[in-house]
Amino acid sequence: MKFELDKQDGRARRGRLIFKRGVVETPAFMPVGTYGSVKGMMPEEVADTGAQIILGNTFHLSIRPGTDIIEQHGDLHDFMNWKGPILTDSGGFQVFSLGKMRKITEEGVHFRNPVNGSKIFMGPEESMDVQRKLGSDIVMIFDECTPYPATHDVAADSMRLSLRWAERSKQAHGDNPSALFGIVQGGMYEDLRQESIKGLTDIGFDGYAIGGLSVGEPKEEMMGTLDFTEPHMPKDKPRYMMGVGKPEDIVEAVRRGIDMFDCVIPTRNARNGFLFTHSGVVKIRNAVNKTSLEPLDAKCDCYTCQNYTRAYLHHLDKCGEIQGARLNTIHNLHYYQLLMKGLREAIASETLDTFVSEFYQARGEDVPAL
């Protein structure tokens, strides 16, 4: 992977990630394909929304269907018929989410298979091995996601364990040609975030992610943590904010110098009739949409908005039709990619302030201070 940085507007950055499988323009949003599928979408449809890279889930894919069957197809790209690059997370967050079903030690994590209850162990070496077999273009180190809230001592112990796992991940990654990203941890504590960044940069990675955010903290605390973390991150490497997020959170993070994002929000919310538009959120199952002949978003050129009314989408949702979830997902993913394209163009032309002002004005909101 090669990272090129073309332009800056304030702290915001315009660049690209170059892979053998294609170029990813940044800032970029990655749709989530947990089980090797972006829910409800064909790979070609995902690409048609403008997505250039997607995310796969190491934890879930290692359990179902397992790496053996995926390797028989070639790799994850072949298995799911996705032609572009794929980033795989390490499985750390999913293991963290298991709660009492897992036990963390220095070596790694012992946990129960959530499907059949069998005992499984995953550490840095196991995670790197799975991601190598998946053929990931970007591999994430194995880390512990610090719980929220956490005391300084708990956050420090967790972050330092993640640093030791980062070193082991780098060693286990070995000569794998895929890019390897480190993950900054440290809870909501400035000194711990800085210690994490120094430890990771001393090891050396191809990119750096910010983990442990969007885990239940207030938005102000999330952005405050980003404000004191981002300035210490390497300028010549891509920055990835994991699990974020809502359109306004992406806009604010781009203003603060972040290059990459992923989140299940656009696809999950689509299946629940919660749709994103230039003027804000539309809850398609609300009665006001029952007789509306308007498109979902007049400024959107996606297949859904060009061909269907709000009344039709409301009808499909009320009837529980699969087609409704598909059309909603096509729109939400397209909206996110339009947002990213707009951000990229604004940074390139040094008009980001205007873009941000118009983004919030259309939603009837004030621009948050940086």
Curated annotation (Swiss-Prot):
The active site is at D89 (proton acceptor), D262 (nucleophile). Coiled coil: none annotated. Pathway: tRNA modification; tRNA-queuosine biosynthesis. It catalyses: 7-aminomethyl-7-carbaguanine + guanosine(34) in tRNA = 7-aminomethyl-7-carbaguanosine(34) in tRNA + guanine. Its cofactor is Zn(2+). One of its GO terms (molecular function) is metal ion binding. GO terms for cellular component: cytosol. Its EC number is 2.4.2.29. Residues 243-249, 267-271 are annotated as: RNA binding. One of its GO terms (biological process) is queuosine biosynthetic process. Substrate binds at D89, S90, G91, G92, F93, D143, Q185, G212. Keywords: Glycosyltransferase, Metal-binding, Queuosine biosynthesis, Transferase, tRNA processing, Zinc. InterPro entries: ArchSynthase1/Queuine_TRR, TGT, TGT-like_sf, tRNA_ribo_trans-like. Belongs to the queuine tRNA-ribosyltransferase family. Homodimer. Within each dimer, one monomer is responsible for RNA recognition and catalysis, while the other monomer binds to the replacement base PreQ1. This is Queuine tRNA-ribosyltransferase. It comes from Hydrogenovibrio crunogenus (strain DSM 25203 / XCL-2). The lineage of its organism: Bacteria, Pseudomonadati, Pseudomonadota, Gammaproteobacteria, Thiotrichales.
